[in-house]
Amino acid sequence: MRDILAEIVAEKKEIVAAAKRKLTLADIKSQINPDCFKMGHSFKKGDWNLIAECKLQSPAKGRLNSTNTVTELAHIYEDNGAAMLSVHTDPHFLGSNDDFIKVRKEIKLPLLRKDFVIDEYQLYEARLLGANAVLLIARILSPAQLKEYLFTTWSLGMDALVEVHDEADMKAALATPATFIGINNRNLKTFKTSIEQTLELLPYADKERTLISESGVFTAEDAKKLKDAGCDGILVGEGLVRADDIAAQTRKLALI
């Protein structure tokens, strides 16, 4: 069976190596602005929060939206109740650093850089791009890396959404002081989704952390089920970008 995650990680190593040749870590550190508005400043535990994702393509389903640009999606989300935006910078999702920069220039909401972090370099790169938060996927990092990258992220003035998919991932995340834990309903090997993944993992989660259900949310009923189960918010991409009325769908999922 095709392992999409393994393919992405293998290619990511080459992408990061090329980025380092173009702009060294020392160069990035010299350009970083120390001021940063963190994810946690607007994304609060106890409230219902929608992270709306600017995603044009999926490795499993191909093109998801051919009508809107990433910045157009970002404006729709910001105007209709999203607490935060997730912007892909990985080419498998038609994402790029240039897209992130464009959104950062036009949007005031905090931004999550959505990518596959395998090297500390990417954390500094995210800060240079203007990210308020990064995604750390427990599945592709060792326990030591996960903890180290979390502290590096904080030292740069950003927050981290630590992503888990099963009990082993959850155990690794809970062994760190991570504030935000995202339960990915998408199996990163097959890219199939089900919100049952979140419902099954919630009993193993620390309810003192801010818990986000990621992917597979398509209706207000899905969102309400997750909220009632104990989630503090959702991260939604396909469920927004493929909607007939993206603005109306954003409002529905943001106002649960």
Q: Language-model segments: what does each one mean?
A:
Residues 128-145, 182-190, 231-249:
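Glycine-rich phosphate-binding active-site loops on the catalytic face of alpha/beta enzymes
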Residues 180-222, 227-234:
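Catalytic-face loop-and-helix region of soluble metabolic enzyme cores
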Residues 200-204, 227, 242-256:
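C-terminal helical cap(s) of enzyme catalytic domains, especially alpha/beta-barrels
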Residues 8, 52, 77, 126, ...:
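Conserved, mostly hydrophobic/aromatic
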Residues 118-130, 166-176, 213, 217-236, ...:
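Catalytic cores of alpha/beta
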Residues 54, 61-161, 167-172, 198-201:
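N-terminal active-site wall of soluble small-molecule enzyme domains
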Residues 2-65:
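An N-cap/entry alpha-helix motif that binds or orients negatively charged groups
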Residues 11, 55-57, 90, 116, ...:
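Active-site beta-loop-alpha junctions enriched in small/polar residues
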